[in-house]
From Swiss-Prot:
Description of its domains: The presence of a 'disulfide through disulfide knot' structurally defines this protein as a knottin.
Residues of the propeptide: 22-74
Tissues in which the UniProt entry reports expression: Expressed by the venom gland.
Function: Probable ion channel inhibitor.
Species name: Cyriopagopus hainanus
Disordered as annotated region, ranges: 61-83
Designated name of the protein: U11-theraphotoxin-Hhn1c
Subcellular locations according to the entry: Secreted
Signal sequence interval, chain numbering: 1-21
Paired cysteines (S-S): 75-90, 82-95, 89-110
Length: 116
């Protein structure tokens, strides 16, 4: 019975000491991995930041190249009064004097072009 206790005590001491060593090793490995993970995250963050800056630069470049004159100015839609001398009807519309039902109105209106 005494040998069983000694054997059990010896196995217990070995298990605790080896387990403690493994625990310290595991702690060291985890520390190294978290440091590597942080460096990887920093690298990924910097890479993403560079890509976003490039994209932003491209977008700003496109905006600066766009001329204000290249865009169509605000136009007047169909059936809306327009100025005879300065028609701003949208493309496909013409500033004409109303016929029939609109003759009592005093101004011109934007109408679709007639295709003959």
């Amino acid at each position: 019975m005494n040998t069983v206790r000694v054997t059990f005590l010896l196995v217990f001491v070995l298990a605790v000491s080896l387990g403690q060593a493994d625990k310290d090793e595991n702690r060291m490995e985890m520390q190294e991995k978290t440091e590597q993970g942080k460096s990887y995250l920093d690298f990924a963050e910097n890479l993403l930041l560079q890509k976003l800056e490039e994209l932003e630069a491209k977008l700003l470049e496109e905006d600066s190249e766009e001329s204000r004159n290249s865009r169509q100015k605000r136009c007047i839609g169909e059936g809306v009064p327009c100025d005879e001398n300065d028609p701003r009807c949208c493309s496909g519309l013409v500033c004409l004097k109303p016929t029939l039902h609109g003759i009592w109105y005093k101004s011109y209106y934007c109408y679709k072009k007639w295709s003959a």
